[in-house]
């Protein structure tokens, strides 16, 4: 039988001038080197034995932190809406665990709902690279796909490492925000690799999976403009669920586009017109990922910490505060101290508001999930103190590349006395890592109320020895209440 595509291609090549034939050949070669194929080759070649011990440890710490964030959001309205809507609209084999719930969902359903749980509190990890990113958003897809396939803890660690490294390489290479797009656009490229690796797909199938979901997942930065809504917690999980479905399509023979990211970089105006994807097998960006102490935007971590440090010196004297001066980076001022941030209307905007978060820290001596979930941020005393906050760009931050998060806070009283605090790096920054005790405390704080002390402790132990478990169900069975 004649291969129709080869017949047409051969006939066309024969009828074209020599120059045009060369162009066709070059185009085919370029397709083979397209980003989808390079990413798929990286994922296919990666295995547990190639991961250095410090990377394995980093993955386990990130799983612990991510599960803490997810359990902290169990019962939150956005997650309930997502779960109810998905179950009503889509059917699928019930094979994957929804965190904090009895009963199973489809892989895509668990990816979506668990993803919303992970992101909702704004407490999950942070990478301050070419664009800020929260790479732990890929972990729900990895757990769900691993659970469906019945793979091991080592397989899960490898898939998560692939998810992190490919996503962080993309945010460094593309510069999404400079083009008016959000870094969550990576979801459509990352999750087909995670699913493909766990499901034993070929490189070509993984590349097609990215070519199916990637072009649809370009997300406008408008989601972070003005008042922030629940959609902040949905965009990556939605893209991840679609990426998992795209991997299924590709595994069954559906083909996808190639060179999507190259086209995107060339056709949109951003910080670079070149697409240089650095995916060296010996470079692990996961080691540059930080954890969060406070449920706030990344740029607010040092500001909140400074406020907490100043709290004790202001006890009983807050009524006498005349002005609060904050010096921070230009990006932090633009993102967290615009006029709308002084009068937030939603929880999602409040935890991205410098004046509100600093006021909470100064008044309460901490900034917690409860302050947002129980509407403490809306209180008149918080708004009154927030109005006294003046934000300036720190001279030391001018020209400094992204990742500089130093903040200076000076509180001046009506008496003329002033108190000040400078924080160079936030607790949890890779250059100031969160301690094991602090990470354990964060985990137990959020997991114990859902699972109970005994099961929470067993889940934590399972995470610490993740590379030793033969079946990931040993982990996932502990994610739901007994």
Residue locations for each model-derived region?
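Well-ordered alpha-helical scaffold segments within catalytic/enzyme domains
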Residues: 73, 142-149, 192-199, 246-250, ...
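Generic structural signal for well-ordered, non-membrane alpha-helices
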Residues: 37, 41, 140, 161, ...
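Glycine-rich, mobile lid/loop segments that gate access to catalytic sites or pores
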Residues: 154-239
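Hydrophobic alpha-helical hairpins/lids featuring a short glycine-rich hinge
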Residues: 125-165
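A short glycine/small-residue-enriched secondary-structure motif
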Residues: 107-122, 135-140, 161-170
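Secondary-structure transition/capping motifs at alpha-helix termini
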Residues: 148-151, 198-204, 314-318
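Well-ordered alpha-helical segments within folded domains of soluble proteins
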Residues: 136-143, 187-194, 240-245, 300-304, ...
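Terminal-appendage/accessory-domain detector
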Residues: 2-131, 224, 228-241, 248-482
């Amino acid at each position: 039988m004649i291969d129709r595509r080869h017949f047409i291609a051969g006939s066309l090549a024969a009828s074209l001038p020599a120059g045009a034939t060369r162009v066709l050949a070059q185009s085919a070669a370029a397709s083979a080197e397209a980003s989808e194929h390079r990413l798929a080759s990286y994922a296919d070649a990666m295995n547990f034995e190639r991961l250095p011990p410090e990377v394995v440890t980093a993955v386990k710490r990130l799983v612990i932190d991510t599960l803490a964030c997810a359990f902290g959001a169990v019962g939150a309205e956005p997650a309930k809406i997502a779960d109810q809507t998905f179950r009503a609209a889509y059917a699928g084999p019930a094979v994957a665990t929804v965190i904090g719930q009895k009963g199973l969902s489809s892989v895509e359903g668990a990816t979506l709902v668990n993803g919303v749980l992970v992101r909702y509190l704004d407490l999950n990890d942070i990478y301050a690279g070419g664009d800020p990113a929260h790479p732990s958003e890929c972990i729900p897809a990895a757990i769900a796909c691993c659970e469906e396939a019945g793979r091991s803890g080592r397989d899960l660690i490898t898939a998560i490492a692939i998810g992190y490294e490919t996503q962080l390489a993309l945010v460094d290479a593309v510069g999404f925000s400079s083009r008016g797009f959000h870094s969550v656009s990576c979801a459509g490229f990352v999750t087909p690799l995670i699913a493909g690796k766990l499901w034993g797909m070929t490189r070509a199938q993984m590349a097609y999976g990215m070519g199916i979901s990637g072009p649809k997942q370009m997300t406008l930065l408008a989601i972070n403009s003005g008042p922030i809504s629940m959609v902040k917690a949905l965009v990556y999980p939605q893209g991840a669920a679609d990426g998992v479905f795209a991997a299924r399509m590709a595994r069954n023979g559906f083909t996808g586009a190639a060179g999507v990211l190259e086209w995107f970089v060339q056709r949109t105006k951003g910080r670079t017109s070149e697409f240089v994807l650095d995916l060296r097998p010996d470079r692990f960006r996961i080691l540059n990922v930080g954890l969060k102490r406070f449920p706030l935007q990344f740029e607010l971590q040092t500001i909140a910490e400074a406020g907490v440090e100043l709290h004790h010196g202001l006890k009983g004297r807050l009524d006498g505060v005349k002005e609060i001066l904050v010096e921070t980076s230009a990006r932090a001022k633009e993102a967290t101290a615009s006029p709308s941030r002084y009068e937030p209307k939603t929880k999602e905007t409040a935890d991205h508001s410098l004046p509100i978060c600093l006021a909470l820290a100064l008044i309460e001596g901490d900034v917690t999930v409860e302050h947002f979930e129980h509407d403490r941020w809306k209180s008149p005393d918080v708004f009154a103190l927030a109005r006294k906050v003046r934000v300036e760009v720190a001279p030391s931050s001018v020209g400094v590349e992204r990742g500089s998060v130093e903040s200076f806070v000076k509180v001046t009283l009506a008496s003329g006395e002033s108190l000040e605090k400078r924080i160079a790096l936030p607790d949890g920054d890779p250059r100031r890592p969160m301690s094991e005790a602090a990470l354990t405390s964060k985990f137990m704080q959020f997991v114990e109320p859902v699972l109970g002390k005994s099961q929470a402790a067993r889940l934590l132990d399972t995470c610490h020895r993740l590379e030793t478990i033969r079946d990931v169900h040993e982990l996932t069975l502990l994610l739901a209440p007994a």
